[in-house]
Amino acid sequence: MSNKFALVTGASSGIGMEIATYLASKGINILLTARREERLQKLAENLSKEYKVTVDYIACDLSNENAPNDIYAFCKSKDYQIDILINNAGYGIKTPFHETSMKDEEKFIRVLGTSVIALTKIFLPDMITNKNGKIMIVSSVAAFSPPSSIQALYGPIKTFMNRFSDSININYSQDGITSTALCPGFTVTEFHTSSGVQEEMDRVPSFMKFSAQRIAKEGVDAMFAGKGVCVPTKTYKFLVFLLKILPSSSLSLFGRKLAPGRYNEK
């Protein structure tokens, strides 16, 4: 058995599960991680049976600051060499920013931000030693969009993640390491239900919603091609192009129109 593995966070559903499935279909061993152990166990069994690869899992919550170190220790105990790192774990917060607690926001930052940095930092030295590494950070078109007061930190964190991915490419490409920021738009997953925004998702036109399977395939293909940024589908490529050329004043107005009633009532 090869000891080379792809580590996929947030692998129990949605884009993470589809990325794990697509990687397994390419004959790559997978280490799954997410909070829901039963789902991980079932997915591991299904993937290993379907694609004849080794699939293992470790249940953990990336809002726990020790989780990245626990994952690394697990890999070392099994002699797993992680040469593909998929930073996918994430969620949304529906509550307006001024109504959330600081603990809510700190947890949010740990899952979407700090854990990505920590996992990348932990596994990077081994990738440098092996002169080989593929990193994906599942970001969002929200990185290019005006922020809303419902998810005030979501877009800014994704913008930071895109720049962090750029930094990895600039500093470590000479070591055989590339990083890809995958920036999908509206994707049909459990994300919107678990984040309490399914009603808003239902109002999105069908031509702007895409399957997690398609997003995963485009993202993984871009990662193996060494692309720095992947915006899946022509629909969102065009949207991002518009967002980049619009003046900041127009983007701010657009953001206010997307904000909850406290703006729209004025």
Residue positions per predicted region:
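Conserved glycine-rich cofactor-binding loop
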Residues: 12-14
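Conserved glycine-rich Rossmann-like NAD(P)H-binding loop of the short-chain dehydrogenase/reductase
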Residues: 26-43
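Conserved NAD(P)H cofactor-binding loop of Rossmann-fold oxidoreductase domains
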Residues: 88-93
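Substrate-binding pocket helix/loop in short-chain dehydrogenase/reductase
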Residues: 96-98, 104-109
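Active-site helix of classical SDR
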Residues: 120, 156-157
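Residue(s) in the substrate-gating loop at a strand-loop-helix junction
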Residues: 140
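C-terminal helical subdomain
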Residues: 181, 202-239
